[in-house]
């Protein structure tokens, strides 16, 4: 069977499943969720400056950070340059140990969030545009906490469906990424958010089914490959740091 036909059948099946799932969602089929309904969002907002401090330390070596498609290769359909950098703490439940060690306060905060599966710093360069796309599965909610927002905030925006939002430092937005969404940073400053995927709550029995499906996805080839790519980057980074450290020590002895 041709791959395109398999993809079409798979996509249609997912759409059918999602239409059933949303009937069991206490939040309905919305574009944006009300963050006030999730107490953990306030905890993040109240501690955003501590998160920002750890981010600033990470950004001191910005050029060494991996591009999104270097970690998650399927992202090449929406980005193929070096204008969207990432710093992963968690990816679909897989912990990036050395990165988490560099950001202990942020890690502790995200680990306290019920259903947290993915957490990373999403770093958009000035002028970066992410074309319209949709997420693969309705079983998670996408959350962004504004950490570095350009002064011309009106020119840095996200569209979900037919609604537009702007990020604010220290404030979060949460949306259903299975609705078509698009991002523009039409400014001369970078935009950074703490990017989270959270297991979406559903009434029984769909909640248990959803958690099972997410566990299966976490073992899929594309997630496994992304985990391998992340581990390779961490190893290269550690080796580079060790080499630089040794060079500095040697220079000090001269």
Predicted regions and their residues:
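A short beta-strand-loop-beta hairpin characteristic of the jelly-roll/cupin
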Residues: 148-169
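Conserved metal-binding segment of the jelly-roll/cupin
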Residues: 165-180
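A short hydrophobic beta-strand segment most commonly corresponding to one strand
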Residues: 142-147, 174, 189-204
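Short strand-connecting beta-turns/loops that link adjacent beta-strands
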Residues: 152, 188-189
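Fe(II)/2-oxoglutarate oxygenase catalytic core
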Residues: 1-120, 124-134, 191, 205-254
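Short, conserved beta-strand element in jelly-roll/cupin
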Residues: 123-125, 136-152
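Short beta-strand His + acidic residue motifs that chelate non-heme Fe in jelly-roll/DSBH
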Residues: 130-133, 175, 181-187
């Amino acid at each position: 069977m041709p791959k395109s036909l398999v993809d079409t059948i798979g996509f249609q099946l997912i759409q059918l499943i999602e239409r059933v799932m949303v009937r069991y969602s206490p939040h309905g089929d919305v574009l944006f969720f009300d963050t006030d309904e999730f107490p953990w969002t306030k905890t993040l907002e109240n501690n955003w400056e501590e998160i920002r401090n750890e981010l600033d330390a990470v950004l001191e070596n910005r050029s060494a950070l991996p591009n999104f498609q270097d970690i998650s290769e399927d992202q090449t359909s929406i980005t193929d340059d070096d204008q969207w950098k990432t710093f992963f703490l968690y990816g679909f439940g897989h912990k990036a140990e050395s990165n988490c060690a560099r950001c202990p306060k942020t890690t502790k905060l995200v680990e306290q969030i019920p259903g947290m599966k993915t957490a990373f710093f999403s770093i958009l360069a000035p002028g970066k545009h992410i074309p319209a796309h949709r997420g693969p599965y309705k079983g998670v909610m996408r959350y962004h906490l504004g950490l570095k927002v350009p002064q011309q905030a009106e020119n840095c925006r996200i569209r979900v469906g037919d609604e537009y939002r702007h990020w604010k430092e220290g404030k979060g937005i949460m949306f259903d990424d299975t609705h078509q969404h698009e991002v523009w940073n039409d400014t001369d400053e970078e935009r950074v958010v703490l990017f989270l995927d959270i297991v979406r709550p559903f009434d029984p029995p769909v909640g248990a089914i959803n958690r099972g499906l997410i566990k299966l996805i976490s073992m899929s080839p594309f997630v496994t490959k992304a985990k391998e790519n992340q581990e390779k980057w961490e190893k290269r980074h550690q080796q580079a740091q060790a080499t630089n450290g040794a060079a500095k020590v040697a220079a000090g002895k001269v």
